[in-house]
Amino acid sequence: MAPPKAEKKPASKAPAEKKPAAKKTASATDSKKRTKTRKETYSSYIYKVLKQTHPDTGISQKAMSIMNSFVNDIFERIASEASKLAAYNKKSTISAREIQTAVRLILPGELAKHAVSEGTRAVTKYSSASN
């Protein structure tokens, strides 16, 4: 047990000399831990859409949480259905067609029509911007 104690003392002395560097790495690891625990949400996008439609209306944290859960749920349903459609057609890639069909299957009537038209418009805008 004496040799490990002797080894620990010189090791603790060496980092003591490099404390400023150790603090930087410690703060870097702390910030990395914070980024790992950070939860990604659609809050900023929901807020932007709210301000486009109702500029003088706000939203509470609870309502924002509900909206975020709603968006996550719809996203999960569409992705799951699109995945099934790709599997049925023996394809390993989900394309815009699978997403469009999944939206038509999941959303009811007029809502599906509007979603498909808005999605098509967004894809067209993205394609023209990237060229």
UniProtKB/Swiss-Prot annotation:
Modified residues (N6-acetyllysine): 8-9, 13, 18
Post-translational modification: Monoubiquitinated to form H2BK123ub1. H2BK123ub1 gives a specific tag for epigenetic transcriptional activation and is also prerequisite for H3K4me and H3K79me formation. H2BK123ub1 also modulates the formation of double-strand breaks during meiosis and is a prerequisite for DNA-damage checkpoint activation.
Pfam families named in the record: Histone
Biased composition (Basic and acidic residues): 1-20
Keywords carried by this UniProt record: Acetylation, Chromosome, DNA-binding, Isopeptide bond, Nucleosome core, Nucleus, Phosphoprotein, Ubl conjugation
SUPFAM superfamilies per record: Histone-fold
Covalent cross-link (Glycyl lysine isopeptide (Lys-Gly) (interchain with G-Cter in ubiquitin)), residues: 125
InterPro entries on file: Histone-fold, Histone_H2A/H2B/H3, Histone_H2B, HISTONE_H2B_site
Covalent cross-link site, Glycyl lysine isopeptide (Lys-Gly) (interchain with G-Cter in SUMO): 8-9, 18-19
Localization in the cell: Nucleus; Chromosome
Origin: domain of life: Eukaryota
PANTHER family linked to this entry: HISTONE H2B
Subunit structure of this chain's protein: The nucleosome is a histone octamer containing two molecules each of H2A, H2B, H3 and H4 assembled in one H3-H4 heterotetramer and two H2A-H2B heterodimers. The octamer wraps approximately 147 bp of DNA.
Function according to Swiss-Prot or TrEMBL: Core component of nucleosome. Nucleosomes wrap and compact DNA into chromatin, limiting DNA accessibility to the cellular machineries which require DNA as a template. Histones thereby play a central role in transcription regulation, DNA repair, DNA replication and chromosomal stability. DNA accessibility is regulated via a complex set of post-translational modifications of histones, also called histone code, and nucleosome remodeling.
Similarity annotation: Belongs to the histone H2B family.
The protein's name: Histone H2B.1
Organism from which the protein derives: Scheffersomyces stipitis (strain ATCC 58785 / CBS 6054 / NBRC 10063 / NRRL Y-11545) (Yeast)
Gene: HTB1
